[in-house]
Design a protein with these regions (language model features):
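Sequence/structural segment immediately N-terminal to covalent heme-attachment motifs in c-type
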Residues: 42-68, 81-94
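Axial heme c-ligation environment in periplasmic c-type cytochrome domains
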Residues: 69-76, 97-152
Length: 153
C-alpha cells in the first residue's frame, strides 16, 4: 500500500513539474509592437473605402470599376482618377451634370454630389478607387478633402 501511495505521489509531482514548465513557456515575455507601419494604415483606408464604394459608387461604376458604356464612366486608369486630386475631390463633393469624355467615349448620366459624406469617407473611397481596378496612385487625405470642401462651398 505504501509503495502504491509513493508511486502515486511521485506521479502527481511529475505531472506538477511538467505543468509548471508548460505554463512558463506560455507566459514567456513577447515582443512589444511599436507603431503600425504605413502599409497597415493604407490597408485600413482601403477597407473603409471599399465599404463606402459598395454603398455609394457600385451601382453606377460597377464592381470592377468598369462603369456602364455611354452612361457611367469607368474608373480604370483614367486621368480623372489618377490625375489631379483636387478635381476628383471636387467631383465627389459637387457632382457633375454635363457629359464627360473618357478615351473618346462620352458618358451622359449625371453624377450626384456626395457632400453628405465625411472628409474621412471621401478620402477613403477616393484612395480605394485610386488604388483598385489596376490603378496605382497616391492616397487622398481627409485634410485634402477638408481644404477642397472649404473652397467649393
Amino acid at each position: 500500500m505504501k509503495r502504491g501511495f509513493i508511486i502515486g505521489v511521485f506521479f502527481l509531482l511529475a505531472m506538477q513539474v511538467a505543468q509548471s514548465q508548460t505554463s512558463q513557456k506560455k507566459t514567456a515575455p513577447t515582443k512589444t509592437t511599436t507603431k503600425a507601419p504605413a502599409s497597415s494604415s493604407l490597408k485600413s483606408t482601403m477597407q473603409r473605402g471599399e465599404l463606402v464604394y459598395k454603398s455609394v459608387c457600385l451601382t453606377c461604376h460597377q464592381a470592377d470599376g468598369g462603369g456602364v458604356p455611354r452612361m457611367n464612366p469607368p474608373l480604370i486608369k483614367t486621368k480623372w482618377v489618377l490625375g489631379d486630386k483636387t478635381k476628383l475631390i471636387t467631383l465627389m463633393l459637387k457632382g457633375m451634370n454635363e457629359p464627360i469624355e473618357i478615351e473618346d467615349e462620352e458618358y451622359h448620366n449625371p453624377m450626384p454630389p456626395h457632400a453628405q459624406l465625411s472628409d474621412q469617407q471621401i478620402a477613403d473611397v477616393l484612395t480605394f478607387v485610386r488604388n483598385s481596378f489596376g490603378n496605382k496612385a497616391s492616397a487622398v487625405t481627409p485634410t485634402e478633402v477638408k481644404s477642397v470642401r472649404a473652397k467649393v462651398k
